[in-house]
Amino acid sequence: MLTRALNDLKNPKSKTGSLQIIATFTGTTGSMGFITGRRYELIVRYIRSRGRFEVKTRDGQLFCPYQSTEAFAKNWSASAIQKGA
């Protein structure tokens, strides 16, 4: 589910500009300020000019870039995904 949504976002033909995701961080605590096991409301965008995903918390407090769908999926477990504009 998560990988498919990220790949759709990355697709140049996609009209989706962002994803809103509720996810639990499964990576290492302290990585860019995120805490293992905590749920976050995220906004994810794919920046084509940089070739990466940019993830920020909905409140804008935390940010983390990811180079691939695999890297993102390795650190997050999504419970809800909604396409944004």
Spans of features found by a protein language model:
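Intrinsically disordered, low-complexity peptide-like regions
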Residues: 5-9, 57, 73
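Intrinsically disordered, low-complexity segments
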Residues: 12, 16, 29, 34, ...
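Intrinsically disordered, low-complexity, charged/polar segments
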Residues: 61-85
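Compositionally biased regions
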Residues: 15, 19, 50, 69, ...
